[in-house]
């Protein structure tokens, strides 16, 4: 799929029901099953008065069910950044109820989401998702107080388009595995939105250890979504899995860890620079230690005294956002 599907068309676009969406161990979820599961949850959510629903999931397929059902039902998905019961109870004013794949012991509304192992005999497209709909994410911020970040669906779609234009050919035929959670924007974008937009099957569980990565079946080629925290713990003594492409974000990737990764997987990592507030800003194919960052198309940096302001198609505010990082630009617009 060269043209990424916008989120509102993940279900409604004319595609075969047997299109694989996600897998876990020996089980595969298809588009037909996703359509069935989302339709059931949409019907349930329409009967609820609450507008804002927190998504707390370990299974990425069921996360997608909840995300799509919330939006198609006209609700607002809230991603609190965790699934800890004590914190959810403290944050209850932020949402009307909780959608989860587990029976959480919390006060208030809880809907446990499951897959019914069924498809719909005759698919009736769900109501369109209004382009003004959005997802709310909460980050801890520097003070530890939850900070609300709004991500409009149109911005998520534009982000998928930028990534498809940059990496699309290399992603063809890949299955997506990840060591990051969809409870943060990086995981939401790369583990959920990108594979769904590109029609790439995704692994429904998170990889916590290098041993899990090494144990992946060799009948697939993988796009591995990871972070410096995971890559520094790789064990080169393990058998290397067939990873075709590696993306890292969430911090600086030390050169020694790049070298270890290349020695094991025989591929150079692609790094992403950005933040929850800004979305993706720049990338680099890390074949050298001090390689500069290259901005994505439409991303513009503006120097303001000692600070830097950025505008981009992904930033809703017309005036852009100010960055905390100190960036040094060369004559070609690349930076370090």
Please tell me what each predicted stretch does.
Residues 302-336:
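Conserved ATP-binding/catalytic segment of the ANL
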Residues 204, 266-306, 316-320:
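Conserved ATP-binding loop and adjacent catalytic segment of the adenylate-forming AMP-binding
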Residues 93-103, 150-166, 171-233, 245, ...:
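AMP-binding/adenylate-forming
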Residues 30-31, 134-161:
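Conserved AMP-binding A3 loop
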Residues 235-289:
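Gly/Ser/Thr-rich phosphate-binding loop
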Residues 5, 15-17, 115-138, 169-176:
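Conserved pre-ATP/AMP-binding loop-to-beta segment of ANL
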Residues 8-9, 17-47, 151-154:
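Conserved AMP-binding/adenylate-forming core of the ANL superfamily
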Residues 43-83, 174-182:
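Conserved AMP-binding/adenylate-forming
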């Amino acid at each position: 799929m060269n043209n990424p599907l916008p989120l509102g068309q993940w279900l409604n676009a004319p595609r075969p029901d047997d299109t694989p969406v996600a897998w876990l161990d020996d089980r595969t979820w298809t588009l037909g099953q996703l359509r069935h599961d989302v339709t059931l949850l949409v019907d349930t959510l329409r009967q609820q008065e609450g507008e804002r629903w927190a998504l707390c999931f370990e299974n990425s397929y069921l996360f997608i069910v909840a995300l799509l059902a919330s939006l198609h039902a006209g609700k607002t998905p809230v991603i609190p950044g965790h699934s800890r019961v004590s914190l959810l109870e403290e944050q209850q004013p932020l949402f009307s109820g909780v959608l989860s794949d587990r029976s959480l012991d919390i006060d208030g509304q809880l809907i446990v989401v499951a897959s019914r192992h069924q498809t719909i005999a005759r698919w009736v497209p769900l109501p369109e998702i209004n382009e003004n709909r959005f997802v709310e994410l909460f980050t801890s911020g520097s003070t530890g107080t939850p900070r609300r970040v709004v991500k409009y669906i149109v911005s998520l779609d534009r982000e998928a388009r930028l990534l498809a234009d940059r990496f699309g050919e290399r992603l063809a035929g890949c299955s997506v595995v990840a060591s990051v959670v969809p409870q943060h924007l990086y995981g939401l974008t790369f583990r959920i939105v990108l594979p769904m937009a590109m029609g790439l099957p995704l692994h429904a569980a998170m990889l916590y250890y290098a041993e899990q990565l090494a144990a992946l079946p060799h009948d697939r080629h993988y796009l591995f979504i990871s972070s410096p925290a995971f890559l520094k713990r790789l064990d080169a003594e393990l058998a290397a899995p067939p990873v075709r492409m590696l993306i890292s974000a969430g911090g600086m990737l030390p050169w020694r860890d790049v070298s270890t990764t290349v020695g094991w997987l025989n591929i150079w990592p692609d790094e992403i620079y950005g933040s929850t507030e800004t979305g993706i800003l720049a990338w680099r194919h890390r074949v050298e230690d001090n390689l500069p960052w290259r901005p994505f198309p439409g991303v513009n940096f503006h120097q303001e005294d000692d600070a830097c302001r950025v505008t981009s198609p992904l930033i809703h505010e017309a005036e852009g956002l100010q960055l905390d990082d100190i960036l040094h630009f060369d004559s070609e617009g690349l930076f370090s």
